[in-house]
Amino acid sequence: MKKTIYLIGIAASIMGGITSCTLDAEDYVTKSSENFPATTEDATQALAGIYQNLNQVSATPECSFLYAAMLASDDCLGGGGPNDLHMQSLDMLMNSKQDMTQQFWKDRYQGINRANSLLDGIGNIELAESDKNQIEGEAKFLRAFYYYELASMYGRVPLTITSQSVEPSQPTAAELWGQILQDLRDAAEIMPNTRKTDGHVDKYTAEAMLGRAWLFYTGMYCNGEDLAALTSTTYSPLTSVALPDGSTLTKDQVIGYIDDCVNNSGYSLVTSDFRNLWAYTNRFTVEDYDYTTGQGLKWVEDDNAVNPETLFAIKYNKLADWSTSIGYANNFALHFGVRGMAG
């Protein structure tokens, strides 16, 4: 009996000790919107995730804005095999199926959400001012670039600039393009005057893209007005655009940004010989072809040099296969290149 009472007393003591403990429920492993980004490394990882969306779209290039724009233009012709209905329909500005570009829509909004998340949290990270401005500028550029492609392809797409938006509203054309232009202007203003060469965008990339977006919105897109109701006499391109922050962007300001890019960026056109832009003039093969041998040609990217004409390029490698890593190789080249050696 005494033994039983003694054991019960021990058990009661143990249970009392357990109930008096405080359970630490904080998750030290999983990253979420509540704890990420919190460090400089987190910010770098988050920015890499936004860039990764460029490769994600490359996994299914036939769904992308670039693919449709190329086939709809005079730059190339729709080809492929007899069963490539998707590509043939794009070439004729037709639908092959209802969700033919759905993957592009999903991918680009995923990239936008990643940009929103980083921009929402970057103020909570202790960063040097120049580093913070560079990261914030790159995130704003990429968000603007993704919206630019979506708006160019679909028109008035839902607009969200915060990761907390659950049901974003459909903006007017002026609101949507105002946000695109504001992001690009902000990126050009805050990023340091340092040219990037590692696949990242810089101040001058933002200035150039600002000019491109301005020309499309006030030119080809006719300020977002009803194209059917416009004529050459009734259409008047905008000379200023109201931005969401209450400021105004003028045509003269855009010209100033472009002039800064041309005069101060270090980017330039290759004027020596057009063929120097193409890889067949590299020092290992330039003498292999009758049309290049003995002509003093030199590829602009020989010896790891950077093409002076390239302001912004998606980074690819040669390691991708047909699995989930396919987007890390230039899958556009697979579609636009020579189909086979047999003719």
Language model region names:
Residues 35, 39-62, 80-154, 164-200:
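Conserved, well-structured interaction surfaces
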